[in-house]
């Protein structure tokens, strides 16, 4: 795997504006970067595909185990009054759309799973669409090796999945929601709306605080239309604790992502994976912080509900060598053996490996100058060659 410098497209900012990529710069710092790209081999892509598929199936085995155990539901911090709702979502095979595994890998040895973003993964639009446009433009300009391709079937698979949701599950109208003042989330929602529209599903967007509760206990939109199918870019760990959580089970909504995803988007997944698949080559040793576990010289402490690296700390010989602030931690912690992210130049690189409908669908690569990848990371495109 190589990081290769390349000339930026002179008009990429205009293209970003034209295509509605409104978060290519965030907080005054570049997010989308194309002064370089990552070059993989076909064998490396096949390895990522194989590992991603296997890890995902292992995660589904965890759901099966947790659903069947009150003790584990408690350990995963699923509120007791929502157990039936979460369990039924799994037992009735509620469909999912997509997820992203974060992997540490430099192209040699085995990729290591750092975490599973199974509920509200972002960086989708730039991985699925904008880096593909970059590939086409740079190929046409003759700036890439002949025969360059990209590990990226995301858009095609998303549209195909929406067609399945319409034909097999009756998704005629899909509401989509996120929080206000979140330009990246809004961009992700807009992209998914476009994919659903391509699949001939009608869509309606509303902000999460605009969702109402009708007289019959059903959720409604601003036009008092009953919400039957809802894609939410809003975490289950919040929803299961809010006032309306008691209404979830009887509201008759088909959720994307389904409630069973609350189990595998949760860092408690990592210790259970290690317990169920000990010494698996793509896993790192991980344990619940409060449980007895082997001492580790260098490890990472992660809150069960942490997002974007918040409240994650790296410990070496009992001392904190790096830490990120945030609002998480009261829910409990897990510890995971430290595994260094590959370093290219002065930045650390993280691979986000995407799945759509349980199938590997491509990657997005982010860089961060800090060891803990946060929401100010930078996205770089990639290619592969045979």
Swiss-Prot record:
Mg(2+) 1 binds at residues 102, 115. The keyword Coiled coil does not apply. The record marks 100 as: Transition state stabilizer. Disruption phenotype: Deletion of this gene does not affect the ability to synthesize glutathionylspermidine. There is no visible differences between wild-type and mutant strain growth in LB media. InterPro entries: GSPS_pre-ATP-grasp-like_dom, PreATP-grasp_dom_sf. ATP binds at residues 100-102, 267, 302, 309, 336, 371-373. Mg(2+) 2 binds at residues 115, 117. May be a ligase forming an amide bond. Shows ATPase activity. Despite its similarity to the C-terminal synthetase domain of Gss, is not a glutathionylspermidine (Gsp) synthetase. Cannot synthesize Gsp, glutathione (GSH), or GSH intermediates, from GSH and spermidine, cysteine and glutamate, gamma-glutamylcysteine and spermidine, and gamma-glutamylcysteine and glycine. Does not bind to Gsp. This is Putative acid--amine ligase YgiC. It comes from Escherichia coli (strain K12). The gene is ygiC.
